[in-house]
Amino acid sequence: MSKIYKSLIPISSIFIGIYAFGVYAFLELGVAVHPIMKANFRAHPAAIYFHIFPSLIALLLGPFQFNEKFRTTKTHLHRLIGKVYLLCILVGGISGLYMAQFSFGGTISHLGFALLAVLWIFTGYKAYSSIIRKMIVAHYHWMIINFALT
């Protein structure tokens, strides 16, 4: 894998994270979305924030977990960040599953976002259960899938 490609994922994750943080932390809720979604955001602010901020934390933490030097030299920190990441996935996934019913775009959109939330939680569970059983390669593969969903 080229150095450019390897750096593209963390850089884009950080920029997306900075943008999302700015929009949801400093702007009026719903200002950056379609007017119909703005009403949904305002009707369910707690669910939106329980989805956005844990998901944002996961998005920002994820790339560091894939850095081989970090994983091998800072094992304790890798494990701690991994637990925080998976907790964020769980909270973001549950709130995302709840919010899927209010998504913009009809039934297909509702089902797509619900499936995304279920797969996000499922792959996080599989990654965690793999590492608990010392299946490091399986854990790594499940985490790649999980972060791709992130």
Annotate each PLM feature.
Residues 1-150:
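Alpha-helical membrane insertion/targeting regions
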